[in-house]
Amino acid sequence: MKMLKKLLAVVLTGAMALTLLTACGGNAVTEKSIADAMTDMAKAQGAKATFTPRAEERELARKIAALREGKATDENSYDAIKKILDYDQGGVNENNFVWTDTVFTDELGTSGQAYEFINNNVLMLSRAWNGLDLFGKKAAKIHYMGTALYKGTDKKGNPVTVRVIVVTAKAEDPQQPGKA
């Protein structure tokens, strides 16, 4: 069984590399296809996470994309994003782990974008915006996600298309040994 898992991981990695090299661009990529690819990659890494697109996270991603496209300064951007994600005490996401990330979509297909999100530690609890606040908790298996696109610039000032992703997962108490 271990050998089969290793073989599956190698095949999936090869497929991702092939997709990265032959992708036709990121604008035709759907949230559902990214969610499916992220679920496959998480399973290949041994993580028990299923990514599911949801309107609430899509709206959060849309608001962040609008903020980023509006050329907000870094100092104001952090506080504005924190307010959008609403994870402080009494907030909508108070009891959810909340992750965000961005990726340049030009020349990246579904697997390429999903790989970037997974590779940037979207599964690490400590990388969640509120990971320290929820220390000692674990993320539920279902991870809800939403994405939005905006036009930005790379480090050289070239125009690029950027995808914002927002992922949430309910914070749960870890199961104690001997308890059901």
What do the PLM-derived regions correspond to, one by one?
Residues 2, 25, 103-104:
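N-terminal low-complexity, intrinsically disordered segments
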Residues 19-23:
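C-terminal motif of bacterial Sec signal peptides marking the signal peptidase cleavage site
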Residues 26-91:
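Short, well-ordered surface patches within globular domains
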Residues 89-179:
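A well-ordered secondary-structure block
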